[in-house]
Regions:
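Conserved glycine-rich cofactor-binding loop
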Residues: 12, 19-20
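Catalytic Tyr-X3-Lys loop
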Residues: 91, 98-117, 132, 136, ...
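Substrate-binding pocket helix/loop in short-chain dehydrogenase/reductase
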Residues: 96-97, 104-109, 191, 199-203
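Active-site loop immediately N-terminal to the catalytic Tyr-X3-Lys motif
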Residues: 98, 145-151, 173-174
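Active-site helix of classical SDR
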Residues: 120, 156, 164
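Alpha-helical segment proximal to the catalytic Tyr-Lys
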Residues: 125, 169-170
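Residue(s) in the substrate-gating loop at a strand-loop-helix junction
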Residues: 140
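Short, flexible catalytic-loop segment of classical short-chain dehydrogenase/reductase
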Residues: 144, 182-193
Length: 203
């Protein structure tokens, strides 16, 4: 491991949706930089924690449930006080507006947007006491695109940008930052199978 980039030594980071894809890559990068990393997902992300090694800690978390967040805020203290929260968990079913039902709309908002509020509710108080913290929300560059069948997803991801801007202002005097990151289409298992030609064309 390259110790020259261990800029997060002594910090504890929490990454949601860390079983695979972007979340797993972020968790591994934070660990490489010296952080203790709490990795969460709907199913226990054992593989990610194992790849990290002794500084990786796996917890099961449904980001839509406030009780799960409350429980995690207590259990995570065994690892340490959380300094960095990376909200990466996402839900993105393709539905045309004609086929979009309220249950799908609400699940999309709960997963993609409510989770950011809940993480702040339960981890912001500790950051304020320590006068240091980082919130990172994984949004999407799709907020600036017109994609058929994704109105609910785009709305939720635009909401992340707005929430992070507001949160950043609320915590600016406490040594805490809040930022949204808008990645483009990323070659992960979540986007489904791709032919080699498709991969070359897109990625």
């Amino acid at each position: 491991m390259n110790t020259s980039i261990r800029t997060h030594e002594g910090r504890v980071a929490l990454v949601t949706g860390a079983a695979q894809g972007i979340g797993q890559a972020l968790a591994l990068a934070l660990a490489e930089r010296g952080a203790e990393v709490i990795v969460t997902d709907l199913t226990l992300p054992k593989e990610t924690a194992s790849r990290i090694g002794p500084t990786g800690h796996a917890f099961q978390l449904d980001v839509t449930l406030e009780e799960d967040w409350r429980s995690l805020s207590l259990k995570s203290r065994d690892v340490g006080e959380v300094d960095i929260v990376v909200n990466n968990a996402g839900y993105f079913p393709n539905r045309s507006i004609d086929d979009l039902d309220l249950a799908t709309w609400r699940k999309t908002m709960a997963t993609n947007l409510d989770s950011h509020f809940l993480s702040a509710k339960y981890f912001l108080p500790g950051m304020r006491k320590r006068k240091w913290g980082r919130f990172v929300g994984i949004s999407s560059n799709m907020v600036g695109l017109a994609i058929t069948g994704m109105s609910h997803y785009i709305a939720s991801k635009m909401g992340i940008v707005g929430f992070m801007r507001g949160l950043a202002n609320d915590v600016a005097d406490d040594g805490i930052t809040a930022n949204a990151v808008l990645p483009g289409l990323t070659n992960t298992l979540a986007i489904g199978p791709q032919s080699e030609a498709q991969k070359r064309a897109v990625f």
